[in-house]
Amino acid sequence: MVDALVVAGPAGDAGRKALAPLRVLTVPAMFGAEVTSGLRGMVQRGELTEQRARVALRRVRSARTMRYPFEPFAARVWELRHSISVYDGWYVALAEWLDTTLLTADERVLSASGPRCRVEPPV
């Protein structure tokens, strides 16, 4: 999502293209905090200006999202702990439950052996 919000070039273009047809973005409840953390890191590393980060945060706040709590997915997230982070596991567990494809640019998730859903990079 951060790529789609602020990254120029092919990575950002792929993210924006993948998100464009979606009316509602289905995400874990932590989505806003996670994106904010990613933007903060980019600003601290000098990869993003404060102004562009503020614009991206406004986009996140205005995005139509369906947010899901952690608790219903906790057991599955725990099962995935050996191959991906808890945070990534939440996205995987949610995609599995929704019987949908998880789009991610995260190589660790793309190459993980635990997910039962399709995991693909945005194209």
Q: What spans do the regions from the language model cover?
A:
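Alpha-helix capping/helix-boundary segments
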Residues: M1, F31, F73, Y91, ...
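Acidic catalytic patch
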Residues: A29-G32, R52-H82
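Short, well-structured N-terminal submotif of metal-dependent ribonuclease cores
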Residues: M1-F31, M42-Q51
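Acidic, PIN/NYN-like endoribonuclease modules and their adjacent C-terminal/linker elements
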Residues: L80, V92-V123
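Short active-site oxyanion
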Residues: R23-L25, T65, E96-T101
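Residues that scaffold the ATP/ADP-binding catalytic core of kinase and kinase-like folds
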Residues: A4-L5, G38, A112-S113
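Short beta-strand scaffold positions
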Residues: V27, V86-G89, T104
